[in-house]
């Protein structure tokens, strides 16, 4: 059951799509405070949720802020990252969920100030509070997801492997990447283009020197099974003669200063204006700009810098230059030098600059900081709504860096500028179920790490987790070590692990689609699947993938294995990636086990009475188009037989709910397999 309590006059974030809900006179569980709420926690209570954030699956013990922030240092001391996800579940003496529908800053003190107190602070008393009661953790998530609407569904090819780099500078570099993947029998479906494909970092342009025949090049790549995925940034360059800029100024589509003039900030192209994503007309206009690339054969995009990031605001920059002039005439001692460096550092993403510009919304003029968390959401919404108008029957890939709840209906996310640190493998694992709770099913990290220099063993281990993420993308920063998998010594292991991803695609796609269509979770903490197991509640480095699989990736350098907790008897599946993905299986009892895992191996675990549908002929697969989703082999741990609801569709259109897409597969105790649809063949 969901209950609602309204405080003040909330801004309509359009995060909620559910129908009328009973209004609460008094709120259960939470104690009302002057600026928010509190909850007295027992020692065994666990806090789940908050989407993409640092630290563990259990959020207890730290303070988090819902404040979309451009911060590439994902360390334990941070309180906010790129998104705002105000949904949390308390599990313990009471079990309930709550969602705070508010577009500004919300602080979740999860036992940081007082170990036994959850304290939620909302910047203003204008918000909606939803309390969700359910029979289980999964039921609470299900009800919440129905409240906020169906998760985004990408095209099937978007579940393939993507290779990215800041930046592949021209057509020949992209061709080289594709050729090396193909020569080394490594499947690939997409090459991602970073900012240098543009003409001087201007949105919706292509550099004619580097990509002189972009439409022809996109067609050339598509003929090889490769989709180009260009970046779109959140700001428009100030430049006379640039059509997007000219149209935006003429029609008043940009965010403004208090006096009504366009607000000027600086990012990649220098001085820019921010499109007013909360103005419905401006949002529709910005979304329509994607057509220039759709018309050239592009079928996927990624939205970046949409917190929005600010390198500098023009007025602050002027004051800084003036102060630097004064400092240039001084002898800088420790105090003045500290003031000087601090002043320059505070140019970027300064909180006061977010109070200087305004939006024209359906509810009137709003200062940006009061609706800050909606910017990235509505940028991706602009694209999603435009795709509905321009390509109503076709799925287009779109994922974003910044997000808040509501955006999950329009696109996915990647988890931002991580680093080539072993701790960030574990961080990526922690983020997966928390994002799933909030509706963001299509998500994934930068495999191998974006910042810093990676190592071969780190990339291999990261793929050991990444092949189970819906978004599988290797991405790295300019100036760091190149980390395309074919550049490393153990090419056979990389080829095998990527081929394994494609062998698993029938299961991964089926579980993703069922989670999206039924408002469920593709990835969940062990406690959600095994609610009666007290130890499963404590496990922070294992998760369930779909209904059948438990994964426990290795995330420490030089480790040749790890301890794993199994809540029940399971089938251990060991895949020898360097040996054409040879599979070894053995049954393990419930409990704790040390599991050896060599660098060229992937090990996962399968529940008893479950089936795992796999594709065939991994070595022949170059892209998702080569995967036959209708000719399957089954891996089973089913001594008494088992059944599985398998989902498959054309992967391109949007008629997801057709009954014929759901296939009932059974396996009897003698190993005989059959499906109830003639269109799908299975063998045990």
Predicted regions and their residues:
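Extracellular structured ligand-interaction cores
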Residues: 82-86, 93-95, 103, 126, ...
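Short acidic-glycine loop/turn motifs at beta-strand connectors
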Residues: 89-94, 257-259, 567-568
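Short, hydrophobic/amphipathic alpha-helical packing segments
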Residues: 64-68, 81-84, 175, 283, ...
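Catalytic core of carbohydrate-active enzymes
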Residues: 374-375, 380-396, 402-413, 428-431, ...
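N-terminal small/glycine-rich loop or linker at the start of catalytic domains
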Residues: 150-164, 261-274
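Glycine-rich, histidine-containing beta strand-loop boundary motifs that form or position
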Residues: 41, 50, 91, 99-102, ...
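Aromatic- and carboxylate-enriched substrate-binding clefts and catalytic-loop regions
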Residues: 187-494, 529-530
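Catalytic and substrate-binding clefts that recognize carbohydrates or anionic sugar/phosphate headgroups
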Residues: 1-155, 165-166, 171, 178-183, ...
């Amino acid at each position: 059951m969901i209950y609602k309590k309204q405080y003040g006059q909330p801004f309509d974030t359009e995060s909620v799509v559910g129908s009328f809900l009973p209004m609460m006179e008094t709120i259960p569980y939470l104690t009302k405070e002057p600026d928010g709420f509190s909850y007295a926690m027992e020692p065994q209570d666990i806090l789940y949720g908050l989407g993409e954030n640092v630290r563990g699956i259990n959020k207890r013990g730290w303070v988090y802020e819902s404040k979309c922030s451009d911060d590439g240092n994902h360390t334990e001391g941070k309180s906010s990252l790129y998104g705002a996800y105000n949904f949390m579940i308390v599990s313990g003496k009471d079990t309930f969920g709550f969602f705070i529908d508010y577009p500004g800053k919300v602080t979740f003190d999860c036992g940081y100030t007082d170990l036994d107190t959850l304290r939620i602070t909302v910047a203003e008393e204008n918000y909606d509070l939803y309390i969700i009661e359910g029979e289980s953790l999964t039921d609470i998530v299900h009800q919440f997801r129905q409240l906020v609407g169906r998760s985004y569904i990408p095209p099937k090819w978007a579940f393939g492997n993507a290779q990215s780099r800041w930046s592949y500078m021209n057509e020949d570099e992209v061709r080289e990447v594709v050729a090396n993947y193909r020569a080394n029998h490594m499947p690939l479906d997409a090459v991602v283009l970073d900012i240098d494909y543009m003409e001087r970092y201007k949105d919706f342009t292509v550099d004619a020197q580097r990509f002189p025949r972009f439409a022809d090049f996109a067609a050339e790549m598509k003929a090889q099974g490769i989709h180009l995925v260009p970046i779109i940034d959140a700001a428009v360059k100030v430049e006379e003669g640039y059509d997007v800029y000219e149209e935006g100024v003429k029609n008043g589509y940009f965010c403004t200063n208090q006096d009504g003039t366009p607000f000027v900030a600086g990012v990649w192209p220098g001085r820019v204006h921010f499109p007013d994503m909360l103005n419905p007309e401006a949002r529709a206009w910005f979304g329509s700009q994607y057509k220039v690339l759709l018309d050239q054969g592009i079928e996927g995009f990624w939205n970046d810098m949409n917190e929005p990031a600010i390198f500098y605001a023009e007025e602050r920059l002027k004051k800084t230059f003036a102060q630097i002039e004064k400092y240039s005439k001084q002898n800088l001692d420790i105090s003045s030098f500290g003031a000087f460096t601090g002043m320059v550092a505070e140019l970027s993403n300064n909180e006061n600059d977010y109070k200087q510009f305004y939006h024209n919304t359906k509810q009137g003029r709003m200062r940006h900081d009061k609706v800050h968390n909606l910017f990235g959401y509505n940028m991706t919404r602009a694209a999603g709504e435009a795709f509905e108008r321009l390509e109503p029957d076709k799925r287009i890939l779109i994922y974003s860096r910044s997000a808040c709840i509501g955006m999950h209906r329009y696109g996915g996310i990647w988890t931002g500028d991580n680093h080539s640190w072993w701790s960030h493998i574990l961080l990526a694992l922690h983020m997966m179920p928390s994002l799933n709770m909030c509706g963001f099913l299509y998500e994934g990290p930068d495999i191998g790490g974006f910042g810093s220099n990676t190592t071969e063993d780190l990339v291999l281990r990261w793929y050991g987790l990444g092949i189970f993420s819906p978004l599988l993308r290797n991405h790295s920063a300019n100036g760091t070590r190149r980390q395309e998998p074919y550049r490393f010594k153990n090419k056979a292991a990389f080829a095998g692990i990527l081929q394994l991803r494609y062998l698993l695609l029938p299961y991964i796609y089926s579980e993703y689609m069922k989670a999206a269509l039924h408002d469920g979770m593709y990835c969940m903490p062990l406690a959600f699947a095994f609610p009666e197991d007290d130890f499963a509640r404590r496990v922070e480095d294992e998760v369930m993938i779909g209904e059948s699989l438990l994964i426990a990736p290795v995330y420490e350098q030089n480790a040749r294995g790890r301890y794993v907790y199994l809540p029940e008897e399971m089938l251990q599946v060991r895949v020898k990636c360097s040996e054409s993905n040879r599979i070894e299986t053995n049954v393990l009892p419930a409990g704790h086990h040390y599991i050896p895992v060599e660098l060229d191996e992937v090990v996962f675990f399968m529940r008893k009475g479950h089936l795992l549908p796999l594709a065939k002929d991994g070595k022949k697969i170059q892209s998702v188009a080569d995967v036959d989703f209708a000719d399957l082999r089954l891996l089973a741990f089913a001594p008494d037989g088992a059944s599985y609801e398998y989902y498959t569709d054309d992967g391109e259109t949007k008629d997801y709910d057709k009954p014929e897409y759901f296939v009932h597969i059974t396996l009897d105790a003698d190993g005989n397999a059959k499906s109830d649809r003639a269109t799908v063949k299975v063998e045990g």
